[in-house]
Regions:
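Catalytic alpha/beta active-site cores
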Residues: 1-201
Length: 201
């Protein structure tokens, strides 16, 4: 590793004199403390990678013939991108932090728990995550909410139109929660989570 070049890059990053270092990723604001820390660690990783990646491959990269993606995370024991098995996590429960999360009993709670899963994954890796067939994966929780509304209908003699409207509202509100939370929560490296949702229909 060229320590003089590493020192120069770190110094230029800290005094913000090299915009290639401070603005290298449009999704990362170098003024945020956690992003600043992430970018600084990335400088070290890129330099260290020069010594651990085969020389001919690094030369290929450095000469511009190709690009080795995510050199700023190369030396970290983090995963890059994943297909989250959220249906299993929701159904069987999981532990996040020190809390044991059990299976949600309604659609709205399932959406809230799903945002917590997304946040935990985003803070434990770099890159994107996919929530495949979200309509299929969340359908059991729409059913749980419907079953609750049917019980309420029976107990209070409510109309079918009323409970159908209540279910529509819960689904809308749950989706809104999922949208707002995943777009406003910031991961440990200072970014909103990169998420792909797909429908199974």
């Amino acid at each position: 590793m060229q320590l003089d070049k590493l020192y120069t890059d770190v110094t230029n990053f800290l005094n913000q004199s090299n915009t290639d270092l401070t603005n290298e990723n449009a999704n990362k604001d170098a003024k945020c403390v956690n992003t600043h820390r992430d970018l600084l660690a990335g400088i070290l990783s890129k330099h260290y990678s020069q010594d651990v990646i085969p020389k001919e491959l690094m030369q290929w990269h450095n000469d511009g013939y190709g690009h080795i993606h995510d050199l700023d995370y190369y030396i970290s024991p983090l995963t890059n991108c994943c297909l989250v098995n959220y249906p299993d996590m929701l159904k069987n429960g999981f532990t996040i932090g020190c809390a044991k999360i059990e299976e949600p009993k309604s659609f709205s709670v399932a959406c809230t728990v799903l945002t917590q899963i997304v946040q935990a994954v985003a803070s434990s890796q770099y890159g994107g995550q996919s929530l495949a067939h979200i309509d299929v994966g969340l359908e059991p929780y729409v059913q749980k909410s419907w079953d609750k509304l049917l019980a309420k209908q029976k107990a209070y003699n409510l109309s079918t139109e009323y409970i159908e409207e209540e279910l529509r509202k819960e689904v809308y509100d749950g989706c809104q929660t999922l949208l707002y939370q995943t777009n406003s929560m910031i991961s440990t490296n200072g970014q909103a989570a990169f998420i792909s949702l797909s429908l199974g229909l």
